[in-house]
């Protein structure tokens, strides 16, 4: 009998029977007198048969979480032993995240399988009625959802992720720009390069390749190894491009709940208790802990604001503790390590040009490390080069209700070709404070650089003059939430060693919602630099009003703007997205200088490509422009494919020969059954078939896969499928009496199903049988012909014994 991905309606007798089996004690004896016309009692109905032999398609449930579906074959030996022996391959394919080293004592050496239920703390239960296999496994015996043992590096693949646009203005030449990311996957390695091409209105053009890296993930050090041209990464020094090798940590490799900063929550539970953590009125964590001390180090990343920890014990008594939290980017979790080691030759520009020949002569070495203690984070970094040396340290301290503060200092020494030497230092300080759930001083920063301080990113031994070398800089950012309103303020001031005067600037933005959905936005900016005669400023006010037209939600927008150039403008428009593929808009612009324009845009996402077109009519010219984006992807299995998906980590899924089925909301499968889905790297992704468009005559061996892809991987999964012939038959004797009970077989001896009490037989066959036999209780056999019976009608059809 083949497997089912659809659930058929059971007869009232079947429902009652399975309900009884589900709630009855395993020691109770089921009265089988109601079964008539059967020569044998199925094992599923016998008392004590927890694992009746047979072929099943079950939901796999681990610790109350459904992890997917799987084929399950129970042998007569397992039925007799009343225990399942599961192979490592089956457990992995079914998505059971178990550490088998903890079950060494349950290994059946002859069958190379594990009888997990022999462990006193583990249960494996099979439910025939719900067709599910339920595991109860101690937490210490489980593999984490994103454990490196579950990482999938993908299949060999090549892809080109692209975006391009072009425009044509009347009376001018066409201008165009294209950007592409080329990636080649081979084993655990990924070769990646970014490139762009431009064509300007004057007819000139340019092609640029920016970088090229060969990288691989290394789980043992929770980081990436990169070879080629890339960028450094450090919390203390400015980043710069280089040719060489780097080994650096990757926080995305951590479980989702361990990414970003969160304080360590500790306490003592008097009894089995539930610990709930909330922030800004929302629960962000909840866990049941046993009596005694507890330590919660898996609270997912939080922002600024008080954490309210509520402990509810077995009697219902609650105690509450408040943890004031303010974060800074350099603040790490307790025990978290961040590192970066790079060696190579500094590049002089952003282009991939003359590798190991451009840039600063000589090799450099850079190393940085950060470590998180309970409430303190230490960072240190160093750069060594024949003509440049620098070192730096910083301390970031969480102050609880007083916020968080960071202080750091760098020293540098530079030697120039003309014999000059520069020595200097840089000091910095940052402070952040959350005053309430709605008010944050996001950042108050100060940085001072002495006259001789030089960043390696700005160092060139042939040029000792650093233009506009910053002396000091102050910076402030503040945010305030007031009901439906958000206010953001930012300001900065800096001065320079080689120039008199100061540069100042600031931004303000206010957004609010009024009158049941009307959005209002107010923005303003100001800047004044010593090398410009006049300040630069601008302000704008805009409204967005939703309305429904023809059953489609539209948005009408109106805006006013004014800038320091003395230009005042007004714009008005309407936009809508009727479907997830289609969006459109119409806009008009006016200015006090007499300029005016009318433009319309249309975007549509095809299965293979995302497109956009725009037509603009000005007072003196007409402009037509368009853009496209997508990915061209090739694997050995799928061949060449085009998709509008542009993620860095992708999955290629296939249902062989089945067209028009979506997977994870993807574009429909093509004529060969392939489609492409976006995936999140180092996270548990469930790749599931959307069942709405699956043909009725198709049976899937599985409907979902769990994958944990590495960054930039192309993962391949195939959903086994069979086209089946479904028959719903009511079997009757020659005189018209309903035949109750009995197992049916085809002329080839294949199992064709079991006749229910109302004479209904559900047959699911891979090929059309011509004749079916049913053994009666007295030993006689009923034969009936299936010739002329049409499969897959969804209707009950009657057949008669011959």
Swiss-Prot record:
Tagged with keyword Heme: no
Signal peptide as annotated in the record: 1-24
Domain of life: Bacteria
Gene3D superfamilies: 2.60.40.3110, 3.10.20.410, Outer membrane usher protein FimD, plug domain
SUPFAM superfamilies in the cross-refs: FimD N-terminal domain-like
UniProt subcellular location: Cell outer membrane
Keywords: Cell outer membrane, Disulfide bond, Fimbrium biogenesis, Membrane, Plasmid, Signal, Transmembrane, Transmembrane beta strand, Transport
GO molecular function, one term: fimbrial usher porin activity
Cystine pairings recorded for this chain: 782-801
PROSITE patterns according to UniProt: FIMBRIAL_USHER
Membrane association type: Multi-pass membrane protein
Summary of the function given for this chain in its UniProt record: Involved in the export and assembly of FimA fimbrial subunits across the outer membrane.
NCBIfam families assigned to the protein according to its UniProt record, in alphabetical order: PRK15213.1
Name assigned to this protein: Outer membrane usher protein PefC
Organism: Salmonella typhimurium (strain LT2 / SGSC1412 / ATCC 700720)
Designated gene of the protein: pefC
């Amino acid at each position: 009998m083949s497997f089912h991905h659809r659930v058929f309606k059971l007869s009232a007798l079947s429902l009652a029977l399975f309900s009884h089996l589900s709630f009855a004690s395993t020691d109770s004896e089921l009265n089988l007198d109601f079964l008539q016309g059967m020569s044998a009692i199925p094992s599923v109905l016998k008392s004590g048969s927890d694992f009746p032999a047979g072929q099943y398609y079950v939901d796999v449930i681990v610790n109350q979480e459904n992890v997917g579906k799987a084929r399950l074959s129970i042998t007569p030996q397992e039925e007799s032993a009343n225990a399942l022996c599961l192979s490592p391959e089956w457990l992995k394919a079914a998505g059971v995240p178990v550490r088998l080293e903890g079950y060494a004592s349950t290994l059946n050496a002859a069958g190379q399988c594990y009888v997990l239920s022999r462990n006193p703390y583990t249960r494996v239960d099979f439910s025939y009625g719900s067709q599910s296999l339920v595991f109860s496994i101690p937490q210490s015996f489980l593999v984490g959802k994103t454990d490196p043992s579950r990482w999938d590096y993908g299949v060999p693949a090549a892809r080109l992720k692209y975006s391009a646009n072009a425009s044509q203005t009347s009376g001018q030449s066409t201008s165009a720009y294209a950007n592409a990311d080329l990636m080649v996957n081979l084993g655990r390695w990924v070769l990646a390069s970014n490139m762009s091409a431009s064509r300007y209105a004057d007819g000139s053009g340019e092609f640029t390749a920016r970088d090229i890296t060969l990288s691989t993930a290394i789980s043992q050090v929770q980081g990436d190894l990169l070879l080629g041209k890339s960028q450094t990464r450090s919390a203390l020094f400015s980043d710069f491009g280089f040719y060489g090798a780097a080994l650096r940590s990757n926080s995305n490799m951590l479980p989702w709940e361990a990414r970003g900063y969160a304080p360590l929550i500790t306490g003592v539970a008097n009894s089995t208790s539930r610990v709930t953590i909330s922030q800004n009125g929302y629960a962000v964590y909840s866990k049941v802990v046993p009596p005694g001390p507890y330590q919660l180090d898996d609270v997912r990343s939080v922002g600024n604001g008080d954490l309210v920890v509520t402990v509810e014990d077995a009697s219902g008594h609650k105690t509450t503790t408040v943890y004031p939290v303010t974060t800074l980017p350099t603040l790490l979790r307790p025990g978290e390590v961040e590192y970066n080691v790079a060696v190579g030759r500094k590049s002089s520009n952003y282009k991939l040009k003359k590798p190991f020949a451009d840039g600063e002569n000589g090799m450099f070495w850079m190393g940085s490390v950060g470590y998180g203690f309970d409430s303190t984070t230490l960072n240190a970094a160093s750069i060594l080069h024949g003509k440049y040396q620098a070192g730096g340290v910083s301390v970031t301290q969480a102050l609880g209700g007083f916020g968080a503060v960071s202080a750091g200092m760098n020293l540098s020494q530079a030697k120039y070709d003309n014999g000059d030497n520069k020595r200097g230092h840089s000091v910095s300080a940052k402070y952040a404070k959350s005053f309430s759930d709605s008010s944050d001083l996001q950042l108050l920063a100060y940085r001072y650089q002495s006259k001789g301080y030089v960043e390696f990113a700005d160092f060139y031994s042939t040029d000792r003059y650093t233009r506009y070398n910053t002396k000091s800089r102050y910076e402030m950012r503040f945010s305030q939430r007031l009901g439906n309103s958000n206010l953001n303020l930012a300001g900065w001031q800096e001065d320079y060693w080689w120039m008199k005067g100061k540069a100042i600037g600031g931004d303000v933005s206010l957004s609010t919602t009024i009158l049941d959905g009307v959005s209002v936005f107010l923005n303003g900016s100001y800047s004044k630099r010593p090398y410009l005669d006049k300040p630069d400023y601008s302000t704008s006010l805009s409204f967005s009003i939703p309305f429904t037209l023809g059953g489609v939600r539209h948005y009408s927008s109106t805006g006013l703007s004014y800038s320091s150039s003395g230009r005042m403008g007004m714009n008005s428009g309407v936009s809508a997205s009727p479907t997830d593929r289609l969006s459109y808009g119409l806009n008009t612009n006016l200015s006090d200088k007499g300029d005016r324009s009318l433009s319309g845009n249309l975007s549509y996402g095809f299965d293979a490509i995302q497109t956009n077109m725009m037509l603009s009519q000005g007072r003196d010219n007409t402009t037509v422009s368009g853009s496209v984006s997508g990915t061209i992807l090739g694997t050995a299995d799928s061949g060449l494919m085009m998709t509008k998906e542009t993620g860095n980590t992708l999955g290629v899924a296939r249902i062989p020969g089945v067209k028009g089925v979506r997977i994870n909301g993807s574009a429909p499968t093509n004529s060969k059954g392939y489609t492409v889905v976006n995936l999140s790297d180092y996270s548990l992704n469930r790749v599931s078939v959307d069942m709405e468009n699956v043909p009725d005559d198709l049976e899937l061996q599985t409907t979902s896969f769990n994958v944990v892809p590495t960054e930039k991987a192309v993962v391949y999964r195939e959903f086994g499928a069979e086209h089946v012939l479904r028959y719903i038959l009511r079997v009757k004797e020659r005189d018209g009496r309903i035949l109750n009970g009995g197992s049916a077989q085809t002329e080839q001896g294949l199992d064709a199903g079991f006749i229910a009490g109302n004479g209904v037989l559900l047959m699911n066959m891979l090929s059309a049988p011509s004749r079916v036999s049913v053994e009666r209780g007295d030993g006689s056999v009923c034969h009936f012909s299936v010739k002329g019976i049409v499969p897959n009608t969804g209707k009950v059809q009657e057949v008669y014994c011959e």
